[in-house]
Regions:
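Active-site loop/helix belt of alpha/beta enzymes
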Residues: 3-143
Length: 143
């Protein structure tokens, strides 16, 4: 039985990385090749959390972070699909991949209009999570 992975992807490609590698990093493709070739693992999808989005001060800024998250997971899925296409075996990986993004600010920036514009270009199934959204009133407005 294969272990299914939700691969962390970093949207920022800088020293403030929260988790994962940026799809722009040269090692990213190499890591995917190892994971995808292994008989012990499969990729369920890609996960991204723009921790820096908590510093955003407007809906527009939060939307920019959301766009960066979506670009990162979409680029990761595109790279994985190209690696799988070059493999000489039948894929046992979850395609379309789950593309999981979000933090409280970026989840709130995901308006129906924004989602409609973005969904047409995604290489997987979108999942938007709200970080600590369920307790955001207590966390974001202490006192």
């Amino acid at each position: 039985m294969r272990q299914s992975l939700l691969h962390a992807v970093d949207p920022s490609f800088d020293a403030r990385s929260r988790a994962g590698l940026s799809p722009k990093h040269q090692v990213f493709r190499e890591l995917l090749e190892v994971i995808l070739a292994s008989p012990a693992t499969s990729i369920y999808g890609f996960y991204c959390h723009a921790g820096q989005s908590y510093a955003s001060t407007s809906l527009d800024e939060a939307s920019q972070f959301l766009s960066a998250e979506l670009k990162a997971v979409n680029d990761a899925a595109e790279i994985a699909m190209s690696v799988i296409a070059r493999m000489n075996t039948v894929s046992s990986h979850n395609i379309p991949f789950v593309l999981s993004v979000g933090s409280t600010p970026t989840a709130h920036a995901a308006t129906p209009e924004t989602k409609a514009n973005l969904l047409s270009s995604l290489r997987g199934k979108l999942e938007i999570h709200a970080g600590v959204g369920s307790v955001s009133f207590a966390v974001m407005n202490p006192g």
